[in-house]
Regions:
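Serine-dependent carboxylesterase/thioesterase catalytic core
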Residues: 1-72
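Acidic catalytic loop of the alpha/beta-hydrolase fold
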Residues: 36, 83-95, 125
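Short, proline-enriched alpha-helix->beta-strand connector loops that line the catalytic pocket
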Residues: 71-76, 113-115
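Short beta-strand/loop motif that positions the catalytic acidic residue
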Residues: 79-81
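Catalytic histidine-centered segment of alpha/beta-hydrolase-like enzymes
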Residues: 122-131
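Beta-strand-rich domain onsets/edges
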Residues: 139-159
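Preference for solvent-exposed, low-hydrophobicity sequence contexts
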Residues: 165-172, 189-346
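Hydrophobic beta-strand segments
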Residues: 175-191
């Protein structure tokens, strides 16, 4: 079974149609994949991977079999899409840097003839893969029955691990994030007080990163909130605050951050981020430090982080909320090359 989100679906389709994968895969699930492009214009970037009128996608979408399907035979296919809230399936080019341009792509762009095409109202581009409703659709498709529960089942013993990465410097584009181990970085974990974000005692875990990139394993208290403190030469000391972890995970990946030149005028920086989804207004109830989150527009959900620049350097609690999830962290002084992240789980 192969499950892919967004661009990953292009790789899955190419592997099954043009590689050797069709005989090895029973089910393929494409979540928010721009199967007909983020735009479709033969005169605009004709060789682009995301051009629905380009050679790559037209080749993948060429009719197959007696019904003219757009999917490789033998494999069972499902697509999951939003009704109208996927930033990359929009008739206007606003989310691809071309506001006012007709993309010639519709909300139905991720659907494929010959697949089971699932539409979930209101979900955003990332939630096509990472939401509970998307999981329910996937589970039914693979097993033929509904999941017993969509709630996260807690474990009595929780072990956490993941990789620590950083940035790679390109002369042309500047620093870009990588998934490569950041050897020599250090990680410390602190249990924190759930109302103030203050540390409770000494570090409960610490490690210097070696070639495998792993910062764990760490046996966590499933009721506790933790502050992850990352440091490495050439980087800012990065404080990441997380909600409790009810289950074990080996993919709690961490990245040491840098402070942008444009942000060095702030006394402190707190960024609330949602890696597994976007912020949508008025769809979601969101606040950062008791106010509307900066930089989150109304309409289609397409922004996954909100940056708060504080005028005071003194450390203090900062609360972030997203629907039912509540994150508490603390601010740290930019003058000491430090910044904070409130990373949402859901």
């Amino acid at each position: 079974v192969l499950i892919a989100n967004s661009r990953g679906g292009n790789a899955v389709r190419n592997y099954l149609q043009n590689g050797s994968g069709a005989g090895k895969v029973s089910h393929a699930i494409l979540c928010g994949t721009p199967n007909h492009g983020v735009f479709a214009d033969p005169k605009r970037a004709p060789n682009a991977e995301f051009n629905g009128a380009g050679a790559f996608l037209m080749g993948l979408n060429a009719p197959q079999g007696p019904n003219g399907d757009e999917v490789t035979p033998v494999v069972k296919w499902m697509t999951i899409r939003s009704d109208n809230n996927d930033k990359y399936a929009q008739p206007d080019g606003a989310w691809i840097g071309a506001k006012g341009m007709a993309t010639h792509v519709t909300f139905e762009g991720p659907a494929l003839k010959g697949a089971e095409n699932v539409v979930i109202a209101g979900i955003d581009h990332r939630e096509t893969a990472y939401s509970a409703k998307a999981f329910e659709a996937m589970f039914r498709f693979i097993t033929g029955k509904p999941p017993v529960s969509l709630a996260v089942a807690p474990e009595a013993s929780v072990v956490l691990d993941g990789k620590v990465s950083g940035y790679f410097a390109y002369a042309a584009t500047g620093a870009v994030p990588t998934n490569l181990p950041l050897v020599g970085a250090t990680v410390e974990l602190y249990a924190i007080e759930p109302r103030t974000g203050e540390r409770v005692g000494a570090a409960v875990h610490s490690k210097t990163i070696v070639a495998d990139g792993a910062w764990g394993p760490f046996k966590a208290d499933p009721q506790a909130r933790y502050e992850f403190v990352l440091a490495a030469p050439g980087y800012a000391t990065t404080h990441i605050y997380r909600s409790p972890f009810p289950r074990s995970s080996g993919i709690v990946n961490l990245r040491v951050e840098k402070i942008l030149d444009a942000d060095k005028d702030a006394a402190a920086i707190v960024i609330m981020t949602r890696p597994r989804g976007y912020f949508g207004l008025p769809r979601d109830s969101i606040s950062l430090d008791g106010k509307n989150p900066p930089g989150v527009p109304s309409g289609v959900a397409g922004v996954a982080s909100s940056k708060l620049k504080l005028g005071e350097a003194a450390s203090r609690p900062v609360l972030g909320t997203f629907n039912d999830e509540r994150l508490i962290g603390r601010s740290w002084p930019v003058a000491n090359n430090e910044l904070s992240y409130l990373e949402l789980t859901y």
